[in-house]
């Protein structure tokens, strides 16, 4: 009789617990995700913090979330991905009443892009797994922008780093106060700060420096994903990613040399042509590259010829394959007095102004 009474008490306790969790399990339970940095480069690590708050006295022995994130983000654990390239990373919590729980994860960003990370729902239950409940989570996702990392000079053959920046011209309005080309005898009309004391000591008389005239370089960067001239389709994903990294490399060089540049991409819905310089403008263009989807809009020759190159001093072409036709178009620009350079995986025309990208990929072109 005592055993039956004990079993009845246990059953009653389980039923009470079941209804308590079914009625009150959802109350006062919240989830949010926080990210250390919202903008990083490829290869960087970022901290993701999950925060669950149980704002009631009833403890929650089992709460489960699933972080939904692209497979390009490495959480350090194995997770299966679906056909869309999305993986789910489970997290299990046990929370006391009136308690906040934090879980910190390190994420390695292996590919550029703009991603959303976070849980879509919370799943919880009582101690026996009977009183189950699900809470949809809204506004719990965070956005992460992964900027493309530039190639290095070692990824090109030959290592042809053109010195973009100030270029010599024959006539200009003002002298360049920083560029010196020889010295001449001081006539008394030059300012005192133009006297070269080293040259004066060697010549035995006052000598003033000669200053050159310069003009700032302004380049247009043409980014093309077309596989070949006869195939109006983008190259493989790996090759297109290399093209984006090469564009990031050229923009980095332009910033180092204080040169003004504009980035034009051969894709549909191209943004209006805008030139600029400096770290801020380069960051804007890197954000464009982070969001771009490799595609083809025009044939490479048409893409090159429709650009207003007359507004620039240099033309930089980045393409999977530099063909004879593309080389002829660039040679025309060269004959017009423009600086010309190309970066390509394959240099079919053996153009001397082309640097070949030597980094290996699994699927070429």
Ranges and model annotations:
Residues 70-72, 98, 149, 173, ...:
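Short, structured coil/loop segments at alpha-helix boundaries
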Residues 1, 62, 172, 209, ...:
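Intrinsic-disorder/low-complexity, polar/charged segments
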Residues 217, 222, 238, 279-287, ...:
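Generic alpha-helical secondary structure signal
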Residues 1-29, 47, 288-365:
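Von Willebrand factor type A / integrin I
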Residues 13-272:
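An amphipathic, basic-hydrophobic helix/alpha-beta surface used to engage anionic
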Residues 265-290:
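Short beta-strand-loop
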Residues 93, 144, 275-278, 359-365:
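Generic detection of short hydrophobic beta-strand segments and adjacent strand-loop junctions
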């Amino acid at each position: 009789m005592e055993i039956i009474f004990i079993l009845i008490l246990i059953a009653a306790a389980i039923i009470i617990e079941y209804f308590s969790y079914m009625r009150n399990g959802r109350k006062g339970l919240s989830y949010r995700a926080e990210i250390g940095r919202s903008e990083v480069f490829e290869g960087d690590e970022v901290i993701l913090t999950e925060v669950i708050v149980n704002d009631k006295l009833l403890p929650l022995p089992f709460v489960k979330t699933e972080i939904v994130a692209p497979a390009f983000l490495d959480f350090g654990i194995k997770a299966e991905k679906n056909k869309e390239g999305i993986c789910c990373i489970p997290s299990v919590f046990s929370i006391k009443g009136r308690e906040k729980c934090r879980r910190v994860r390190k994420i390695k960003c292996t590919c550029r892009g703009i991603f959303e990370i976070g849980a879509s729902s919370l799943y919880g239950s009582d101690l026996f797994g009977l009183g189950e409940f699900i809470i949809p989570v809204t506004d719990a996702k965070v956005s992460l922008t992964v900027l493309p990392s530039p190639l290095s000079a070692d990824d090109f053959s030959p290592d042809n780093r053109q010195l973009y920046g100030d270029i010599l011209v024959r006539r200009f309005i003002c002298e360049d106060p920083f560029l010196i080309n020889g010295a001449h005898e001081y006539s008394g009309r030059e300012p005192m700060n133009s006297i070269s004391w080293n040259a004066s000591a060697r010549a035995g008389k006052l000598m003033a420096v000669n200053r050159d005239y310069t003009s700032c370089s302004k380049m247009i960067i043409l980014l093309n994903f077309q596989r070949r001239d006869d195939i109006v389709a983008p190259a493989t994903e790996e090759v297109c990613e290399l093209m984006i990294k090469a564009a990031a490399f050229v923009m980095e060089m332009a910033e180092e040399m204080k040169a003004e540049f504009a980035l034009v991409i051969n894709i549909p819905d191209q943004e209006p042509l805008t030139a600029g310089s400096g770290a801020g403008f380069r960051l804007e263009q890197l954000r464009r590259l982070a969001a771009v989807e490799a595609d083809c809009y025009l044939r490479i020759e048409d893409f090159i010829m429709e650009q207003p190159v007359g507004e620039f001093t240099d033309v930089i072409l980045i393409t999977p394959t530099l063909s004879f036709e593309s080389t002829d178009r660039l040679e025309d620009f060269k004959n017009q007095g423009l600086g010309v350079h190309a970066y390509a995986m394959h240099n079919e025309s053996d153009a001397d102004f082309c640097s070949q990208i030597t980094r290996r990929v699994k699927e070429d072109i």
